[in-house]
């Protein structure tokens, strides 16, 4: 990202390096390419400034008067960008070069009751649920609303005092079914919110994957239900020996974190078919998240677009035309 401190630090020392080889995952969108390619060629191909790159290859897409929420490529821009960077870039998929097992992706749908759905819909429409002083659940902007709705889809939500208010157990019921159908085979369960983890631990004999001992125990089959947060599932974390099934109890808008966690099991050395289960609450933001992941959309834009219409187009622009290589 052009806004990341890592990018700014690399930009300063890049002229000192005679040769640079960059390794990266799949960019979220074409806009993300500017920073990555810029570090390699110091702005020769896509321009020295993100504003110039944006003006050259993109048009405003979703906007509210002067505030631009997202951009779309100009006609022919995608092909032109790929042409410009083709001499210094190569795309390689592990499945094309390594002996990889089959990977199956499933959607496990759950439904809330009428009263639970009504509560969710009221939060989506009014951005607040009133329970009394210090107990209200409210959202001040699109990002906060998306966060609250995702929590409710999972089954619980924090109020304004930080207390957890339980909504339903639909996903936990579905997880129990998956555990039973696994017949003793280990499951790696991904969660996002702390209350997700707490509710899982309260109901199942699960264990966190945090330390080297946790990793070793998982890989020798000592942990039947392992909990992991996507942000902690970094590159180099090898879990493929301990199991081949992932359950996304809580989805993530981050395509990078999603792919990174799945790659802990779906990687070289995995001997079994990898099954990725996505628990999705029907009629909720879960469906928007899964769609965004499936089309490899820019996560921030997808999140804002999914809820923006409900709150009159409020969003933070937060962009600058002055960031350059």
Q: What is each model feature region?
A:
Residues 197, 205-296:
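Conserved RecA-like P-loop NTPase helicase motor core
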Residues 14-18, 37, 223, 242-243:
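Short, well-ordered alpha-helix to beta-strand connector turns
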Residues 5-18, 25, 45-184, 276, ...:
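Inter-lobe coupling linker of SF2 helicases/translocases
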Residues 29-41, 80-84, 121, 200:
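PAPS/PAP-binding and catalytic site of the sulfotransferase fold
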Residues 273-275, 279-325:
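Non-catalytic, charged low-complexity extensions flanking SF2 helicase motor domains
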Residues 17-30, 38:
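Conserved helicase ATPase motor motifs in RecA-like P-loop NTPase domains
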Residues 186-193:
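Conserved RecA-like ASCE P-loop NTPase motor core of nucleic-acid helicases/translocases
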């Amino acid at each position: 990202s052009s806004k990341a401190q890592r990018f700014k630090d690399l930009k300063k020392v890049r002229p000192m390096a005679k040769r640079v080889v960059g390794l990266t995952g799949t960019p979220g969108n074409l806009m993300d390419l500017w920073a990555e390619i810029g570090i390699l060629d110091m702005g020769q191909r896509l321009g020295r400034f993100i504003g110039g790159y944006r003006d050259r290859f993109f048009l405003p897409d979703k906007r509210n008067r002067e505030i631009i929420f997202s951009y779309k490529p100009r006609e022919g821009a995608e092909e032109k960008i790929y042409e410009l960077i083709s001499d210094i870039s190569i795309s390689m998929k592990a499945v094309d070069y390594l002996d990889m097992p089959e990977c199956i992706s499933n959607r496990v749908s759950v439904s809330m009751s009428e009263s639970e759905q009504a509560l969710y819909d009221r939060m989506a429409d009014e951005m607040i649920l009133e329970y009394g002083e210090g107990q209200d659940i409210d959202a001040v902007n699109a990002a906060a609303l998306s966060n609250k709705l995702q929590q409710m889809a999972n089954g619980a939500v924090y109020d304004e005092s930080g207390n957890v208010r339980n909504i339903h157990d639909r996903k936990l019921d579905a997880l129990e079914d998956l555990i039973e159908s696994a017949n003793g085979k280990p499951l790696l369960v991904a969660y996002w919110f702390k209350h997700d983890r707490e509710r899982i631990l309260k109901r199942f004999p699960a264990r966190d994957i945090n330390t080297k001992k946790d990793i070793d125990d998982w890989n020798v089959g000592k942990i039947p239900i392992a909990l992991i947060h996507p942000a902690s599932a970094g590159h180099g974390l090898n879990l493929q020996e301990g199991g081949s099934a992932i359950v996304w109890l809580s989805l993530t808008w981050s395509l990078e974190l999603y792919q990174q966690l799945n790659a802990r099991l779906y990687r070289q050395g995995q001997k079994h078919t990898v099954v990725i289960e996505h628990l999705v609450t029907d009629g909720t933001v879960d469906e928007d998240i899964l769609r965004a992941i499936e089309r490899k959309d820019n996560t921030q834009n997808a999140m804002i677009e999914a809820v923006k219409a409900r709150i009159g187009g409020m969003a933070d622009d937060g962009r600058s035309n002055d960031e350059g290589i």
